Structures are given as structure tokens and as C-alpha cells.
Amino acid sequence: MSNSSKKHFDLPYRPGVGMMILNADNHIFVGKRIDTKISAWQMPQGGIVPGETPSIAAMREMLEEIGSDKGYIIAESKFWYSYDVPSFLIPKLWNGNFRGQQQRWFLIRFTGNNEDININTSNPEFDQWRWASLDELLSIIIPFKRKLYQAVVKEFESLIQ
């Protein structure tokens, strides 16, 4: 059976990491995805390369997506969080091999300044970026990731206040 004929729920999750990156004011980095016509804001995330630890993947992805690795890990999520992408997106993402992602999340303190951030990387994922408050984060996030973001916020919230 080819991946294109598999049912959505039969596909595995792609292993990955997500980063809740905080500035000195405890605002959260969000980027607007470059590959969609809708206003799709999200926190940086990415895959784990085979043999790579989640924490190493998080710092690599931070550099790849925001152009800076100026920061340090405050906390790692206790759980792996997962989300499913809408079925119409499956053939367009990851060669149709995954139903969504299962991610370890990291709370990262950004130690640089705004001038250190460069989203015009070799493989850009965002065309805009900004710092969002914890209160506004869930209202601007792409809907199919909202439940995952709620869980991540709940886990890290006491460390942000």
C-alpha cells in the first residue's frame, strides 16, 4: 500500500522539537509561515535528525529558523506532544509519510537582541516575525496546533511568570 492510499490515522508521527523562545520581557517568538496564504503564526519547530538528541535538535532548529542560537534552555517538556495536520496537507508535507508531528518542547531564554534575529536563512520558514505575549499566543496560532500549544503553555507557564 502506498503512503498516498494509507488512511491518515495509519501514518506515524514525525519526531520533532518545538521551541518556546522568550525575550527579556517574557514575550514569545512567533513567525508567520512563508508557505501558506492564510495567516499562520507559530513558534519555531523542526525535525530531529537520526542520532541527534532533542535538546541538540532544538538549538540547531533555533539557529536554522531564526538565524541565531543566542540563548539557553530553561526547561524541557516532561511529555512528547503530538498534533495531526489536516488530511489535505498530508500529501504536501514530508512526502506524505507522516500524519503530524510528535514533539519534545523546550523553553528557551533568548539572550540576543532583535538585530540578532534573521529569518532570511538558507531555507526560510517565516516571512514575518514578532514577539507575542502569552495571552495573545493562543489566539494567533494556526488552529490545528492550538490544543498542543495549550498543553505546552500549561506546562511552562509557571516558569514564564
Swiss-Prot record:
Cofactor annotation: a divalent metal cation
Record gene name: rppH
InterPro entries attached to this UniProt entry: NUDIX_hydrolase-like_dom_sf (IPR015797), NUDIX_hydrolase_CS (IPR020084), NUDIX_hydrolase_dom (IPR000086), RppH (IPR022927)
An annotated Gene Ontology molecular function: mRNA 5'-diphosphatase activity
Function of the molecule: Accelerates the degradation of transcripts by removing pyrophosphate from the 5'-end of triphosphorylated RNA, leading to a more labile monophosphorylated state that can stimulate subsequent ribonuclease cleavage.
Record's GO cellular component terms: cytoplasm
Key words, A-Z: Hydrolase, Metal-binding
Positions of the Nudix hydrolase domain: 12-154
Motif window: Nudix box: 46-67
E.C. number: 3.6.1.-
PROSITE patterns noted in UniProt: NUDIX (PS51462), NUDIX_BOX (PS00893)
HAMAP family: Nudix_RppH
Highest taxon listed in the record's lineage: Bacteria
One BP term from GO: mRNA catabolic process
Name of this chain's protein: RNA pyrophosphohydrolase
Family classification: Belongs to the Nudix hydrolase family. RppH subfamily.
Broad class of enzyme this protein falls into: hydrolase
